[in-house]
A protein has these predicted regions:
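Extended assembly/interaction regions that build large supramolecular complexes
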Residues: 161-163
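Small-residue (G/S/T/A) turn/hinge positions that recur once per unit in extracellular repeat modules
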Residues: 11, 25-27, 32-33, 58, ...
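Beta-strand-rich solenoid/repeat architectures in extracellular/passenger domains
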Residues: 1-2, 20-39, 62-74, 94-118, ...
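Exposed, low-structure sequence patches enriched in small/polar residues
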Residues: 124, 244-247, 272-279
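Extended alpha-helical scaffolding regions
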Residues: 46, 51-53, 57, 73-100, ...
């Protein structure tokens, strides 16, 4: 396996264009671009720098592209997109990370040859607002899969998973293409150690099939799961569920559908909420 692409940034600078230039490195994927067989397809820092933690903040713009048979597709490291308020320079404004993935495929198939174990497609570590729209996340069984593989793993991170939309003939907006997750232990994870996280996650217009847990939240500050479909059935460990939330004080679940797979264990659940410490909807 090769090392993949590194996108170097500056943790102390924003992601906006300034005087025609960006402070941050940018990786742009389009027109059916493919990155495959990498240890980390896109790593958003310089691990060889004297202080790697100062080189975060790089930007990814990916559309109509594929990440195939990588041990990890994308790894975001801690970064906040901060800048001075234009009218009140004494104030600092925090914006979402401008990185996005639109209509992209993240897949590991039977051709994956290791030797690194596949653990997760995307790692988001202490960032906020990274967007995934109309993306497909897939995993086929192979001997190099970790015992508990994950689609998107957010650690104290904010992110959005959504479908794409178009205008219908009656003037309303309809879903054009949903995001999908298939065959993971946990498809989408939002977690944190210690205090409840402040960054929010949103999952909308997404189909989950053959996952032990579709959405798993632990110590997440605020989460929203809307207009998504969960086919519950796979079992690797414990009781499968479409949504599992623990120590998560605010979780909004609306207009979701839960069904059982044709092959399913005796115990399975649509939603499990444990020790929410607050009122959940």
């Amino acid at each position: 396996m090769w090392q993949g692409i590194q996108v170097w940034g500056n943790r102390n600078k924003h992601q906006l264009k300034e005087n025609g230039h960006y402070w941050q490195g940018i990786a742009e994927l389009k027109n059916n671009a493919v990155i495959e067989n990498a240890k980390v397809a896109i790593d958003l820092w310089n691990p060889s720098a004297a202080s790697p933690e100062l080189t975060t903040g790089g930007i990814v713009r990916a559309s109509n592209s594929s990440f195939i048979n990588n041990a990890r597709a994308v790894h975001f490291h801690p970064y906040e997109n901060r800048f001075q308020h234009p009218q009140h320079p004494e104030q600092t404004v925090v914006r979402d990370n401008v990185s996005y993935f639109h209509n992209c495929t993240f897949a590991v198939n039977s051709d994956y040859s290791g030797p690194d174990a596949f653990i997760s497609h995307v790692n988001l570590f202490k960032v906020r607002g990274v967007r995934f729209t109309a993306c497909d996340f897939r995993l086929e069984d192979n001997p190099f899969n970790h015992q508990w593989p994950i689609g998107i793993h957010g650690y104290d991170a904010g992110f959005i998973v959504d479908g794409s939309y178009n205008m219908l003939s009656n003037g309303t907006v309809g879903v054009n293409k949903k995001s999908t997750f298939d065959n993971f232990f946990k498809a989408v994870v939002s977690t944190k150690d210690g205090l409840v996280g402040e960054r929010t996650f949103t999952v909308k217009a997404t189909n989950f099939t053959n996952n032990q847990y579709g959405v798993s939240a632990h110590l997440s500050g605020y989460g929203t799961v809307l207009n998504s479909n969960f086919e519950v059935g796979q079992r690797r460990y414990g009781c499968p569920a479409g949504i599992y939330a623990e120590l998560t004080p605010q979780l909004t679940i609306e207009q979701d559908t839960f069904t059982m797979a044709q092959v399913h264990p005796e115990e399975y659940y649509g939603v499990i909420i444990k020790d929410s410490k607050s009122v959940n909807q």
